[in-house]
Amino acid sequence: MKSFDEMTPKEIVQELDKYIVGQYEAKKAVAIAVRNRIRRQKLPEEWRKEVLPKNILMIGPTGVGKTEIARRLAQLSGSPFLKVEATRFTEVGYVGKNVDSMIRDLVEISVNMVKQEKIKEVERQAEELVEERILDALVPESKAVPVVTNPFINLITGGQQQQYTPEDRRRFRAKREEMREKLRKGELENEEIEIELEETVSPFMGIFGPGMEDLGIEITNMFSGMLPKQKKKRKMKVSEARKVLLPLEAEKLIDMDKVVQEALDRAQNRGIIFIDEIDKIAGKESAVGPDVSRQGVQRDLLPIVEGTTIMTKYGPVRTDYILFIAAGAFHVSRPSDLIPELQGRFPIRVELSPLTEEDFVRILKEPENAIIKQYQALLSTEGVELVFTEDGIREMARIAYQLNQRLENIGARRLYTVAEKVLEEISFEAPDIPEKRIVVDAEYVRRRLERIVQDEDLSAYIL
């Protein structure tokens, strides 16, 4: 498979098609946006500064694939990705999260992403160090023979000097190698050992009220280097110790300065922020009530989307080249209800169409992570072969579509509730079923859902 930087917009859309049904226009828009980033990197320096990403506004009801398109695109491109709800933010001066926090969160995600990549590179080396630490716990050094020395030296050194006889050393090495052999064969995984771990005690967390969590985290990070690291001994099995020690030893091998530098560059030039429910902060200004800070949030959001510098604990971050994808249903408000300056910062607008019954059939069958494929994989672990007939799939799609028309339209998410109810009994009985091949056809689906679908009150609560 090609690297992402070599993929054409058409190929990016084809990759997204593996996971998301339909919505061609939205896929096309995001594919062009990320391809333009790659094109920008190839420009001369003076042009590179001038080319800014074209932010995207997705308009469409819930459950049609807005978030999934952005998330899959980020996974495909290896970009740091953050999803936020516009309604979570408040205008500066009000209690709550301010919009700057989304950039700090994006940088945190980017640092963790790069850190995990670097840890992967040194994993083999870290495994060797973990093995040595486990062996230290399994075969502790025996007490050496005390040597009589000058009492004055004993007073300074805090005790008598120790030394090992050659025979002690030989026995110790032989025992250690014997245990190493057993450890590598997996014979000691259930042995209990005592290991020493470092932990930083934070006296600041828990004293900040709602809406001030960011301040608490910032203060904790500021003082984390000054706080003493306490050493604590813990007893655990060798298998558990391996999991605990591996990231600790790997972290010692990576250069955190380089990690931060790469992470900042990645967040600034490849970061994607998905702002959901932006329609909820659109609308006319209200002087009182819960809507008092709607336009304030939009105005706070404006400089970040336009391009500004935000201070984070890792250093300053420029937001000019971060790709912002905003989304909303816009049932009550319209995109034109956003403040004009913010509208201008989302020049690409794509409308996602509501899902049809035929789309539901395709969603159940076609994506690589299709719902029925997930259930088949889960139940195969119990030795159960789950077979869905074409009419069974169509019946599930029909019922989900009808429920969306009768109750609230939640898009493809309705399929999860329908599938869960259809397969509830099978999932519960799976380990004890004598018949290991189960066929889910239209008759089976109707039998499982008939009573619930007919009773509107039950449908509202259960499906």
UniProtKB/Swiss-Prot annotation:
Keyword list, A-Z: ATP-binding, Chaperone, Cytoplasm, Nucleotide-binding, Stress response
Matches recorded under Pfam families: AAA (PF00004), AAA_2 (PF07724)
Annotated Gene3D superfamilies: 1.10.8.60, P-loop containing nucleotide triphosphate hydrolases (3.40.50.300)
Biological process terms in GO annotation: protein unfolding; proteolysis involved in protein catabolic process
Binding-site residues for ATP, renumbered to this chain: 21, 63-68, 276, 341, 413
Xref: InterPro entries: AAA+_ATPase, ATP-dep_Clp_protease_ClpX, ATPase_AAA_core, Clp_ATPase_C, HslU, P-loop_NTPase
GO MF assignments: ATP binding; ATP hydrolysis activity; peptidase activity; proteasome-activating activity
Subcellular location: Cytoplasm
Entries under SMART domains matching the protein: AAA (SM00382), ClpB_D2-small (SM01086)
Example of a GO cellular component annotation carried by this entry: HslUV protease complex
Family stated for the protein in its record: Belongs to the ClpX chaperone family. HslU subfamily.
PANTHER family associated with the record: ATP-DEPENDENT CLP PROTEASE ATP-BINDING SUBUNIT CLPX-LIKE, MITOCHONDRIAL-RELATED, ATP-DEPENDENT PROTEASE ATPASE SUBUNIT HSLU
Assembly description: A double ring-shaped homohexamer of HslV is capped on each side by a ring-shaped HslU homohexamer. The assembly of the HslU/HslV complex is dependent on binding of ATP.
Protein role: ATPase subunit of a proteasome-like degradation complex; this subunit has chaperone activity. The binding of ATP and its subsequent hydrolysis by HslU are essential for unfolding of protein substrates subsequently hydrolyzed by HslV. HslU recognizes the N-terminal part of its protein substrates and unfolds these before they are guided to HslV for hydrolysis.
Protein name: ATP-dependent protease ATPase subunit HslU
